Amino acid sequence: MKTFFLLIIGAFFLADNCCSQSAELCQGAYFTEAQGKTFLDLTSVTSRGAWEARSATIKNQIREGMQLQTMPAKPTSKPIINGKRVMDGYSIENVVFESMPGFYVTGNLYRPLKKQRSYAGILCPHGHGDNPEGRFREQTQKRCATLARMGAVVFVWDMVGQGDSKQCEHKMAKALKLQTINSIRSLDFLSSLPGIDKNRIAATGESGGGTQTFILTALDDRVKVSVPAVMVSAYFFGGCVCESGMPIHKKGDYQTNNVEIASLTAPRPMLLISDGGDWTKNTPKVEYPFIQNVYNLYGKKNLIENVHLPDEKHDYGPSKRKAMYAFMAKYLKLDIKSVSDASGNVDEGPVKVLDQKDLTVFDEQHPRPSNAVMGDEAIMKLL
């Protein structure tokens, strides 16, 4: 009976949306809020076996939809790490490595100054933003530096087309595939660093970085803790080609949404951060209960949490970061007391926000490698 209703509702969604979008692309507010809730009601499962069958289908369509059934050849070149800056309790270094032959990931590596026997590793994909762009923004620098001061090794890298990643435009047709490859290779890079505890690896990002967070976590079990911020929505599918520009949500009668994709994190610890000013406004009543049910199928309902800030907007602001710090400390065994004041509140004051020029990877002394493939057309051929 549920299958019948899924076919009916699928036909309704298609009729309602196909005139304005390609038939198998679900972009932006593809569903209405009511449709998003109805979809979750109809796809909710009552057994672990049923969910694992569904999750296998979802993972397969993500890979098929972004044409990533297999990863491209892994380059043999070594990562370049230089430009170390010693800060208050942490250091920052510039990083360049190939994610596939001819394409370079660019970013910054934040490390704690205090020596430890092993280190948690945290990936910090960033969201869309200008003046400055993603990894140079205050909220991103504070997030990365504070996590490093808590004892983690943190890597933040550029979205394609932003920062130092200027080999193609951000809105290139296969940006979703390229960014997913970059995310997986960033995980490879972080995991390869000396002292990284592979059982303490996490990912957290906001907006488009939230999309990168839950897609990476869905596809790669090496991510043990996930904190997608202001992105998981029953009705909103991501408004950029880097999130929804390839058919990962729909094929024929098959349909999913980002709530189901985020649910693939189960039973690993996950914190959903939501607010009242964007498409996550319904999280406590719609998205969170659905994901709780999935975790409950594993007997791990305690490992999924939601912090909802009804009076806040779409960002990774201080209160959202505060919630994330506590969650990361809990599950990655980080030292949150080392960054807290006498009242127990996280103090980001020691973090110095640097100018973009201080975090830039490429300059006259460190030019872009000569084998870098340039231009959308050339990058599309690589993909």
Regions found by a protein language model. Name each.
Residues 118-120, 150-153, 197-200, 221-225, ...:
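Loop/turn elements at helix/coil->beta-strand transitions in domains of secreted/extracellular proteins
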Residues 223-263, 268, 275-288, 294-300:
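Mobile cap/lid helix-loop segments that gate and shape the active-site cleft of serine hydrolases
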Residues 115-192, 231-242, 247:
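Cap/lid segment of the alpha/beta-hydrolase catalytic domain
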Residues 205-217:
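Glycine-rich nucleophile elbow surrounding the catalytic serine of serine-hydrolase chemistry
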Residues 195-207:
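Alpha/beta-hydrolase fold nucleophile elbow
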Residues 1-25:
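Bacterial Sec-dependent N-terminal signal peptides
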Residues 18-104, 273-383:
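Alpha/beta-hydrolase-fold serine-hydrolase catalytic core, especially in secreted/extracellular enzymes
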Residues 204, 229-230, 309:
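Alpha/beta-hydrolase-fold catalytic nucleophile elbow
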